[in-house]
Structures are given as C-alpha cells and as structure tokens.
Amino acid sequence: YLDSGAVTVSAAGAHYYGLNGEHLAEEVLSVENPVLSASRTTAVAYDAGNQSLFVFRGGAESFRLSLTGSNNLLSARVNNSGWLAVTAQQSGFKGAVTVYNSHGREVITIGLSSVFAVDAAVSPDGQSVAVVTMGQEQGDFFSRLLLYPLDQTEPSRQVDLGALTVLDLAYE
C-alpha cells in the first residue's frame, strides 16, 4: 500500500488503485518477470531482465523509463521522497546505477567496469546511494557495499562483505 492507494504488477502489467477501489492508472503490457518495489508514497513496477519501468505516486503514473538496445533492468528501488535508484546492465559496463529525482530527472549514473552492480538504494535524505556489487578475485567471489555521494562517481565508503550473497537491500 501507498499513502494514496495500492499498486499491483503481474504478467499483464501494472495497475494503481485508490484506497476507495477506484482505478487510478495502469500500464497494460506483457511482463515476463514482474517486480514491485514501494515506499510509503511511491511504487515502482518493472520487468526484471527487460526494459520497462513505471513509477506511481499521488494517484497517477509519475514517471516511466524504457531502456534501449542491450540494456536491461536488474533492480529498481524508490525512497519515501520518490527518488529512484535503477540498476541495469548497460553497454560498456559490467553494471550501472542511475539515480533519478522525484521529478524523473537523472541525477547521476555510476558505471562499473571491474565489478557487477546487482542492487542499489537511495538514502532517505537523497544525498547518497548504496550500491551492492559482486566480483571475482583469484577464483573467489566477493560482495561489496559501496556508498556514493550523489555528486561523485567514486565511492566515499566501501564495506567488504566477503563471500556473502546479498538478497535484499534497504537504506534506512
């Protein structure tokens, strides 16, 4: 639930309903791997491994993103202020994270060439983004959590997670 209604996503697309049951917005399309991520105010519905993403807030669809070429969505997370972190396979990188503000404008893109980006989340204050990465050194897999200020493409902090596989991420 959002403060203004409920969003569902399925193989038939994404639907936004008001708290009174009124149909507020929808995106009807075939979705292979439907995923929904939500905060108190905003929901993002997307097709993991594909190219379509939709953001719902305040009773309407507020933003949409369609990747092109061989770029595909891996994850998308939204904070309570409506800022969005999109992790994607992007040509020329092992992974990339793009942060969008609450108006759908791109703030920063972080391209990673030596490790894979698997997930990301924007801080509650919209000042930084946490990025989960995976890589391999001398045959051993490793994970790291990288913290980036939104005005820098180099991390300000790095947390080595060893061989742990991160299954979920929240920036509180």
Named regions from a protein language model:
Residues 93-172:
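Solenoidal tandem-repeat scaffolds enriched in leucines and small polar residues
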